[in-house]
């Protein structure tokens, strides 16, 4: 009897393993039909999925190419683009209830759906046809059973409504809103929570540079930071049509291309916008008009919102009689940056109105050009760096001192900022008199730390925690220059207290053994899944739990990682790409792309580095199919 039970147990175990293996194989390689019929096409389009989830589209016309882009966006990214559309239309409460109704109210107060629809109607006819072609392909994908059975849509029991051409402009507006600077959050107090809910923020930490390798060949590197979203935010697409070959880094649901290259140029455009401000005016000085928007409630009822607006001015409040506090934002008017994004494909330039349009481009000749007016422009060997925060100046300094290399030095973990600050602070602290052996050990680690934020660094953890406690206690970082002699005693005492607090925190969170205080454990990368991050009672909560990845890097190092010293929400999610000039020769990408429907994917990802792959059209496709006109 015991032997029979053992045999049955082994058979059951074997059957379970086979089932799991089949599930892994089938889910990891869902093969579309060999031929998919679509209305709106004039000729067949060949679709190839290359290694790294890169998509190659071979079309005979630009119109067919945009239909295909819409189709692959819908097939590969249905859940995030539908969620973003629901947010952009101010209809999240219909899906998720009253708790997100304030977000819908914000969207309708800013009139995003209304102005997006008006902006579409104001576009030139050829541009409208591009959006119409894109929506045809996207709707075709959204009607497929494979998309309807996507796990998130099934688990949340969400309906799929048709995609209207102007919906892409609503998403463009939503992203421009999320990209506004934190300084506007006081005027729009719901904006920061909306960013957190969608996990899209931190765009100001994006950076780009061009440097020269040892063979005098320019290398164009760019990094786009976009919050803590665990889902892919970008989709790389190779478009071949009408004798043109264009690499595009696209955002699903939109025709925004933050990165790309044609045969004549490559570009990086930051998803940032500083085109908003608050002002105070006498009421009579503005031609204010009443405007109304309907806010739909989960019950099906509607609430009428009343605002006052004059062109790009929206009244926020009336602090005193006859005086209004207003928000000025171009997104309040029926405009779009679509023409500026499309101009990149034909090597032309056009002005941006919603986004800043700042970034960097390089021509096939090797000539570089700064786009817009980024706040940081620094010379580096054989090129320049453009960025948006003071941290980026330290990146430029580090690039100036590194030896020339054919590879982008984005794996460098050394911080000039930390090295300089540590030297000064240890000089001010001088000697440490304490009987606490753990504080003594921490002090020894600081004195021997080389300013490197790699995974194994213990000094990095102690240093950051030390400064974070000082910042929390005194509302600022320590002065990074020698103060007057009369203030040094006070500063030394303050640094001592902060170090005591830091060690107490590390002891409590990571234990008494400093060898466990490694940077990878103290500050892991935490990537989140929309909705599940805030609704722990949903089905499949374990599958969509946060991804915790080993921490490495810092805002002041070439390897990016958030810091507890930043006053904003940590933004570990990022996409990196680099191109060897002349454009069109070699294009490499590094990013995360979790696939939760694969067996043990969560645990496989934890042991993997960022995936690096080449955007090479000659790569052997993993799968292929054809989009053909529907007769």
Describe these PLM feature segments.
Residues 2-631:
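C-terminal/peripheral segments of proteins
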């Amino acid at each position: 009897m015991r032997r029979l039970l053992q045999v049955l147990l082994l058979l059951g175990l074997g059957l379970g393993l086979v089932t799991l293996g089949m599930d892994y194989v089938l889910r990891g390689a869902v093969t579309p039909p060999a031929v998919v019929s679509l209305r709106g096409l004039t000729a067949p389009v060949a679709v190839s999925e290359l290694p790294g989830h890169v998509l190659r589209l071979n079309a005979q016309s630009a119109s067919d190419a945009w239909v295909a882009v819409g189709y692959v966006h819908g097939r590969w990214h249905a859940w995030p683009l539908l969620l973003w559309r629901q947010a952009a239309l101010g209809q999240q409460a219909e899906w998720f209830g009253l708790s997100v109704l304030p977000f819908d109210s914000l969207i309708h107060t800013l009139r995003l759906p209304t102005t997006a629809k008006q902006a579409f109607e104001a576009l030139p006819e050829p541009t409208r046809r591009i959006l119409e072609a894109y929506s045809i392909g996207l709707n075709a994908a959204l009607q497929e059973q494979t998309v309807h059975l996507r796990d998130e849509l099934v688990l949340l029991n969400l309906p799929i409504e048709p995609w209207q051409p102007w919906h892409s402009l609503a998403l463009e507006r939503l992203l421009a809103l999320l990209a506004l600077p934190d300084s506007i959050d006081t005027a729009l107090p719901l904006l920061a929570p909306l960013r957190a809910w969608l996990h899209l923020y931190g765009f100001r930490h994006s950076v780009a540079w061009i440097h020269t390798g040892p063979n005098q060949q320019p290398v164009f590197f760019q990094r786009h930071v976009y919050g803590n979203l665990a889902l892919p935010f970008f989709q790389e697409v190779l478009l071949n049509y009408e004798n043109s070959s264009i690499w595009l880094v696209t955002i699903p649901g939109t025709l925004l291309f933050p990165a790309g290259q044609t045969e004549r140029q490559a570009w990086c455009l930051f998803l940032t916008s500083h085109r908003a401000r608050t002002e105070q005016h006498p009421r009579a000085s503005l031609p204010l008009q009443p405007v109304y928007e309907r806010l739909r409630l989960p019950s099906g009822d509607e609430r009428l919102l009343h605002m006052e607006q004059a062109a790009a001015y929206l009244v926020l409040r009336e602090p005193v009689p006859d005086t209004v506090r207003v928000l000025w934002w171009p997104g309040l008017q029926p405009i779009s940056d679509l023409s500026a994004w499309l101009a990149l494909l034909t090597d032309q330039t056009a002005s941006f109105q919603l986004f800043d349009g700042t970034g960097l481009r390089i021509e096939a000749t090797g000539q570089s050009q700064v786009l817009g007016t980024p706040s940081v422009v620094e010379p580096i060997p054989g090129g320049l760096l453009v960025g948006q925060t003071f941290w980026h100046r330290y990146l430029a300094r580090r690039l100036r001192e590194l030896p020339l290399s054919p590879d982008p030095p984005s794996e460098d973990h050394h911080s000039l900022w930390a090295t300089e600050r540590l030297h000064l602070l240890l000089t001010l602290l001088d000697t440490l008199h304490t009987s606490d052996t753990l504080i003594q050990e921490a002090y020894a680690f600081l004195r021997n730390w080389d300013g490197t934020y790699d995974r194994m660094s213990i000094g990095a953890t102690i240093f950051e925690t030390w400064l974070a406690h000082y910042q929390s206690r005194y509302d600022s970082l320590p002065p990074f220059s020698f103060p007057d002699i009369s203030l040094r005693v006070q500063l030394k005492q303050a640094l001592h207290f902060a170090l005591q607090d830091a060690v107490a925190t590390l002891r409590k969170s990571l234990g008494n053994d400093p060898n466990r205080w490694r940077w990878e454990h103290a500050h892991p990368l935490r990537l989140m899944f929309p909705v599940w991050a805030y609704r722990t009672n949903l089905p499949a909560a374990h599958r969509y739990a946060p991804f915790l990845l080993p921490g490495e890097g810092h805002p002041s190092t070439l390897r990016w990682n958030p810091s507890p010293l930043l006053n904003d929400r940590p933004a570990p999610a990022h996409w990196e790409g680099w191109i060897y000039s002349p454009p069109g020769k070699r294009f490499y990408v590094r990013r995360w792309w979790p696939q939760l429907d694969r067996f043990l994917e969560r645990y496989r990802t934890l042991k993997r580095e960022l995936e690096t792959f080449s955007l090479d059209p000659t790569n052997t496709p993993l799968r292929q199919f054809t989009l053909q006109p529907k007769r």
